Amino acid sequence: TREKPFTCTECGKGFSDKSNLRSHQRTHTREKPFTCTECGKSFSQKIGLHNHLKCHTGEKPFMCTECGKSFSNKSNLHTHRKIHTGERPYICTECGKTFPRKKNLQSHQTVHTQEKPFTCSECGKCFSQKKNLHTHQKIHTGEKPFKCNECGQAFLRKRNLLSHERIH
């Protein structure tokens, strides 16, 4: 193992070189010096910005050998592969439900805490999960993304489309 003479004064973690220590320290300061010129989103690491830029170029060099779906970064491909393996290592201690990603578990846990951190800017209604806020906001925009191939009727929610399709 390499010598780690550079130590973080905040948490005690050691690093082999000063640039890695500086990069790590931004996790404590929340400093994000790398900014996307396209959309303004900022990152604490240069690699974060580099990976993000691919969403603007559409570049997706990491392909799943199982199904052919492509991803802009290796981390997203790795997470995606859990769909095929069935791996769901993150477990909710409250109800036992399992998740393939840590952030899915964290999002789910707001259901148990009654925390509703996502607020609609249009009407003030609050939601425990971001995806539910996004679905709700379509009420205000009138967007109905799920369309019946049979008759053309459109729906706000996929479950409503599936229910509707049973009548054809």
From Swiss-Prot:
GO terms for molecular function: DNA binding; zinc ion binding. It comes from the Eukaryota. InterPro entries: Zinc_finger, Znf_C2H2_sf, Znf_C2H2_type. One of its GO terms (biological process) is regulation of gene expression. A zinc finger (C2H2-type) spans 6-28, 34-56, 62-84, 90-112, 118-140, 146-168. Keywords: DNA-binding, Metal-binding, Nucleus, Repeat, Transcription, Transcription regulation, Zinc, Zinc-finger. PANTHER family: GASTRULA ZINC FINGER PROTEIN XLCGF26.1, PR DOMAIN ZINC FINGER PROTEIN. It holds the Pfam family zf-C2H2. Signal peptide: none annotated. One of its GO terms (cellular component) is nucleus. This is Gastrula zinc finger protein XlCGF7.1.
